Amino acid sequence: MNNKTYKPFPAIPPEDEPTDVKLSAAMQRLYNCWQPPGDSANELYSNFRYSRVTGIGNEVNVSRRDPTTIINVDSTYYVWYTRRDNNIPPAGLEGQTDTIPAVDWDLADIWYATSQNGFDWTEQGMAVSRAPKGEYGDRSLSTPGILVYENKYYLYFQAFTKLWEPHDCVTIGMAWSDSPDGPWHRHDQPVISRGGSNDWDGCATHDPHPIVFRDKILIYYKGSPMDKSERAFLRAQGVAIADKPTGPFIKSEFNPITNSGHETCLFPFRDGIASIISLDGPEKNTVQFSQDGINFEVKSHIVMPPVAPGAFAYDMFADNGDGRGITWGLCHIRTRSLDIPHERNEVRCFLARFDCDLSLDISKPELKGSNLRFSEATHLDSEARMELSASEKQEIIEKQGSIDRPTIGT
C-alpha cells in the first residue's frame, strides 16, 4: 500500500457513503444495507426485556403457551392462548392415549385472560373447546390467532383430529363471536389446509397470525413439509389471503415468503408489515420488513427474541398505511424435567411479558444497545444444551487425539 495516497476512514462516519476513501465490502454494506449510526438509530432494532406475569404465569400441572396478538377493548387487554390442564407429561406418539398427550400442545383448548396493565392477568376461562368426538378438531386446539373485523371477533387455530400423527400434521380452523368474551361459534372445517405431499407446507399449517392489509385479510402461518430429511425445508412462513374472515383463503404464489422462522409475529409498520423471525433458518433472530406483505428484507439482527410472541399493536387491523410498531407483548417460556436434559421431554410452558422498542412513538435508548453479555447460568444451562454433558465430553476427549494436530511451525 502506498501510504502517501492513503486516506483513513473518519472517526464519525459521514451520513452519506463517502467517495473520497476506499471502502471495504463491510463498509459498503453499512451504507447500502444498514446505516452509519448502527443499531441505536435503527427503528427495527431492539433488545428484549422479560417479566413474570400474574394469573397466567408458571403453574404446576398447567401449560399455557402460544399467546395471540393482544387486543384492547374498552380499556381492557385480552389475550387468547393454548391451555393444557393435565398433570400427566407428554408421552410421545407411542405413549399417547385419549387422556395422555403426545406433546405439550396436545389435548389442549383455547382459553383467554384479561388485564388492566399487561402485567397482572385474570384467567377468564375457556374460549373455544375441542369438538365432540368424531368431529373436526376433536383432539386438540392450539396456537390461536385473533382477528377483529367489522365489530366481530375471529379466532384461528390449529385443529387436531383423532390421535396424534407423525410430524405434527394439521390444518387451521376458525371460530367467531360478537364479543371478545364469547360465546364462540365454531366453523367445523379447515379454513387453511395443508399443501400437497411434496409441498413445503405439506405436513402442517399452523400458528395463524391475521392482519388486515390493503383491503385484504392476510393470515400468515408457519408451514413444514412431510419430508424431514436434512435437505428438506425445516420450517418457513407463508401467507393466505381472503376478502372476508371466513375465506376462501388463497395461498400466495410466492409462498413461502420467509426462508426462516418458527412461530409467527407480525405487526403494521409505516406503510408495510414488520416481522420478528426467530429460532429456525438462515435468517433466524432478525426483524424483517415488507412494503407489500410478501417480499421481506432483513432490517436488524436481534438477540434472545421472545418465543411464540404475541404483541400488542392497537393498529393491527386498522389498515391505515401508518403502522406505529410495538412496545410489548406476551410470549411463552418452556419448563421441562432435567432428569433427561438432552431429550425432547417438554413438560409445560407458562406465559411471560416482553418489552421492546420497535415503535415509532417512543424512544428507549436502553433497549437499543448491543454487546449484550450473559451470566454463567446462561452459558452453562443444561436445559438449553449450552453445557456439554458428561457423555459429550468423553466422546470429544476420545476423538480429539485423532483430530487435533501439533501447531504448524512448532
Summary of predicted features, one role per range:
Residues 1-410:
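Carbohydrate-active catalytic/glycan-binding domains of CAZyme proteins
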